[in-house]
Each structure stands twice: as C-alpha cells, then as structure tokens.
Amino acid sequence: MPLNRRQFLATTSMAAAVSAFNRRALGATAPQAAQAPPGTSFVPVRGTIGIFNGQGGTIGWHVDPHAVAIIDAQFPATAKICLEGIDQRSGSRPIDYLVNTHHHADHTSGNPVFRPVTRTILAQANEPRLQLEAAARAAAAVKPGSPPPPAPVVANATYEKAWRKPVGTEVMALNYYGPAHTSGDSVITFEKAEVVHMGDLVFNRLHPYIDKPAGASIANWIRSLEAIAGEHPKSAIFVYGHANPKFGPTGSAADLLAMRDYLTALLEFVRGQVKAGKPREAILAIVEPLPGFPDQGPLVPRVLSAAYEEVAG
C-alpha cells in the first residue's frame, strides 16, 4: 500500500540533501550531477505526455484520470520536485509504472523517492544487474571509515525484448534493440500520443557517454537508431536523455539520424587514425571537432576511447 504522498515527501527532504552520494553510488563513470540542483520545469509534449527537466536525464511522464507513468528518476533532489508536480497533476494517484531507460545514476538515483508510491518499476532484463554491479563497485571504492552507500532500488519487473500494455487511456510499449549506449537500454513509446522516449540513445548534438564496461556497442547503436527512426510515424515526437541547449530535449526522427551519422563518423574517423598507424594515446589526445559535427564541440577522450576499443579490439 503506497504511503500518503504528503507524508512520504516530508520524509525525503533530508534524503535529498545527500544526493551528491549518487555520483559514486550507481556508477562513477555515468554522467555527473551538479553540486546544486539546477532549475526545474514541467513541459507538456503532446496529449497526456510531458517531460520534466532537472538534474540528470530527462524525465518523461504520462498522467491521465486513470493512470500515471514516469520514465526515469534523475537524482533524489529533483525526483522529489518531480513527484510533487506529478501529485498536483494526478491528484496524488499512485504511480502505476516507473520505467528506468537504463542503469546510470542520473536516471535511477531518484528511484528511492518514487518507490514507496509506485506499483511497478520496470526495466530491460539486463538493467538491474548492471545497476547492482555499478553500486557494488562504488561501495568497494568507499574509503575506510566512511559510511557505506545505501543499497540501490532496482526494477521489480523486467522484460527481454518487448513489453506492451494499456496505461490508462494510453498504450505504453517498451522495446530493446540490443547493446547500444549500454546493454540494457529501453525505448518507450506512448502509442496514441506518438511520443517516444529514447533515454540516452540520443545525446542531441552532444558527445555521448558510451559505456563499454556495461556492454555498449557503437555499431549496433547505429543500426538501432536507424531502425527506431524507420518504425515510427513522421509525426512522432522523440524525447532525449541529454541535449545541447541549442537543440533541446525533444525533436523528430531527423535527430536520431543525426546521432546515427555522428556515431558512424566517429567510428570511421578513429578507424582511419588506427590505419594511419597512430597509437591509442595520440588518438585520445585529438581535440579538434569531429569533421562535419561542429555542434558537439571538441572531441573528448571518452568517445575516442570507446571508438578505439571497438575498432582495434
């Protein structure tokens, strides 16, 4: 039985204050949280679907008189703000589904805020294991004498390849396209509204995080983006986990194809450097923008390293 929402939110105020822990607790290599939460906003997208901008990956939401679904959880401080706003929109209905698009800290650290008022936390089958492994690494790295991090809250329901159910007046579908950003990325489609939450499969005109230790595959990421773009109507609106402010966290299939082209160019660029005989250290030191992709800015070691690993083996 979910707690009274107001009582629960009051008890989480202090927990939110320690949210800085999450940068280590659920994967130190995941995108980092700022020291102080930035401004937050609720933005309608289409129909019953909207997004919440705060600290971490973009949260998606569906609220109608019969059901509530949330996509991703950010960090505790902004998860609390998000939950308060969802309360206002839903009349404090229990949350039917919280979906984690993948395991990274900036998408799952807010799970403890949502858990007491959520019936089901849903993710791709690989995601809970990846989240627990990241938490174990973080716990092992805690200095002697320091308090251990709290245990992560992981999905209590999973799917392998596809999942689809009515959620109030909507139909929510989850699909897994194989290894890409990680090896547990979900794409969430609200079929009636034609809104598709991509999680971190799209960093809109930003250099992405490519989590090789978690099974990422640039080559399959490229194939996945092309498939997703082709499977949805031209009128679909896509939601992105992270975005260059100049371009924003929502857009069209053209953004997916731009991300596909960026990843293709990244692999080809690094492959060319390897064929030219450049050592890994020299490749990782390249800072010029990737040719044809000035909006992402100078190249950074994290993308070059992932591409090198995929090209050179």
Regions inferred by a protein language model and the residue ranges of each:
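N-terminal secretory signal peptides and thylakoid transit peptides that target proteins
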Residues: 1-16
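C-terminal regulatory/interaction regions
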Residues: 9, 275-313
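C-terminal segment of N-terminal export signals and the immediately downstream linker at the start
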Residues: 22-52
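Conserved beta-strand hairpin/beta-sheet module of binuclear metal-dependent hydrolase folds
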Residues: 43-93, 186-190, 194-200
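Active-site neighborhood of phospho(di)ester-bond hydrolases with catalytic His/Asp-centered motifs
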Residues: 71-73, 96-103, 122-125, 197-199, ...
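Active-site HxH/HxHxD metal-binding segment of metal-dependent hydrolases
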Residues: 88-164
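Core dinuclear metal-dependent hydrolase active-site scaffold
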Residues: 158-191
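Divalent-metal (often Zn2+) His-rich catalytic cores of metallo-beta-lactamase-fold enzymes
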Residues: 222-278
